[in-house]
């Protein structure tokens, strides 16, 4: 058959067929992502979600997951638009997405919209503003300086205790423990059992992780009840004798009617769960990068002033939380996708942070990246993470200690990432140090 000359009707039709095939392929990819829960919840995507995020972004910014009421939002602009529309998208955590044995996604129901357990990051204004104001009083510059002294001393003790024959299991010895020690000090707990608090705090987030077996769910529920009982006991003690700490501040706020007791107690549970979890994940990811990328480790050692840029790039590259949920108040649209009332968004920080429309070469770890704090790992706007400054402080102290006490760190054994669609934390990181 004679080939049609360039520009002839035959050539135009041939070009149109190729375009239609490409569009059809893209649509098929979109439908696969949207309908197959295994794609989103599977082990491959849990351990390395970024190739999936890239395919999702290429097909669209908003994806319905497995015919459920959950929509994943993966584009930078769409995520930011959702954050900026609180009148349409509530921060209340009314349900989380879970993976079933049948390979489908279903909701794990939480408190309904406007319920009393929505605090801090999961509260809407005006309640959110009240919660934030109470906590921020204890995260002011003066208090941060006191916490800095405590953190330096605590990190030193954990380092000495964790080092054995030139090795340290970083997550168990330092990353999981230090943030919980800092949270306990901030709240004002007397003689806390840190190992127990870590167990309880992680149990609280395990309920939300989406990949939990029934027996794990039951155990996590029991642990959360134990943590709640402990918090209630400490709160009663503080109410009888308020001290100059967050616990005393909350007790005083309840006595004055500014806050109800249940809300104050849930706020403390949330600080343990989210505050400990997020900083532990940051400390784990940062040291994993240093230990597995000797080129980056050498740059930071040779140029100590790069430590701040390293921390920010770590936050962009591996956000401590994969994302956060939003509740769709009324039927609306986001980036052209129709969203029914009472459906849910999962705003994927990790996907937004690697959107090539926002970041040059987003899959590369760069210490010279412009606009270092331009990532969205700590949220944005009214819900910008209340503990961001404290988390950065802990990271700076711990990483400075690690680099000052060693000449080389290597990863002797790296465990997998926590099976979770909410948290991005390495489970085990054995370091060999010189």
From Swiss-Prot:
Cofactor(s) needed for function: heme
Summary of the knockout phenotype: Cells are more sensitive to azole inhibition.
Binding site for heme: 132, 326, 383, 385
Entry's Gene Ontology BP terms: cholesterol catabolic process
Amino acids binding substrate: 124, 128
EC number: 1.14.-.-
Activity regulation comment: Inhibited by azole drugs.
Alphabetically ordered keywords of this record: Heme, Iron, Metal-binding, Monooxygenase, Oxidoreductase
InterPro entries named among the record's database cross-references: Cyt_P450 (IPR001128), Cyt_P450_B (IPR002397), Cyt_P450_CS (IPR017972), Cyt_P450_sf (IPR036396)
Gene Ontology CC, one term: peptidoglycan-based cell wall
GO MF entry, a single one: steroid hydroxylase activity
Any one Pfam family match given in the protein's UniProt record, by short name: p450
Complex and partners: Monomer.
Family the UniProt entry places it in: Belongs to the cytochrome P450 family.
Protein name: Cytochrome P450 144
Taxonomic placement: Bacteria, Bacillati, Actinomycetota, Actinomycetes, Mycobacteriales
